[in-house]
Amino acid sequence: QAHGMGQLIDLVPNHMGVLGADNAWWNDVLEKGQASAYAEYFDIDWHSATPGLAGKVLLPVLGAPYGEVLARGELSVEYEARSNRWFARYFEHRLPLAPASIFGPLRDAAAGGKPEVLAQALDGINGPAGHDALHALLDAQSWRLAHWRCAADEINYRRFFHVNQLPALRTQREEVFRATHA
């Protein structure tokens, strides 16, 4: 107040919150991987030596190891007709799926415009008999789901301390700096 200020705000412009499905840049990276216009905005190690992480972003959001979560049926696929987009769902996490990864029966069911056919196709992949197909679909993404405890050892992006939902931005790059300060 001695300096005529009513409020002082401490900004952290080199990190960005990505929790939830509201961050368009992060979701674009998840959907398109290295082909995303924003892939270089985040400080992601796309060439990780960790098995299964080359070309992928680690998403340590699971409450248990991946195999257990899959076996318990806690992962599912959703289709959003109004945007013609596909998502993987894990409780509150809604993760975009790469359009090219959507295989024949699901793609055809959505294109057919018959809700009952689409519901049947989704029941097939989301049910116990669809675990192999669901795993193959998830494995084809530019991200890899993992138990949250894996983050300390396997995370392949710089973040704010150990907060997985605050990945670092490469604000040292002029285009990123401008985009984050617009």
Residue ranges of predicted features:
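Catalytic cores of glycan-processing enzymes that make or break glycosidic bonds
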Residues: 1-182
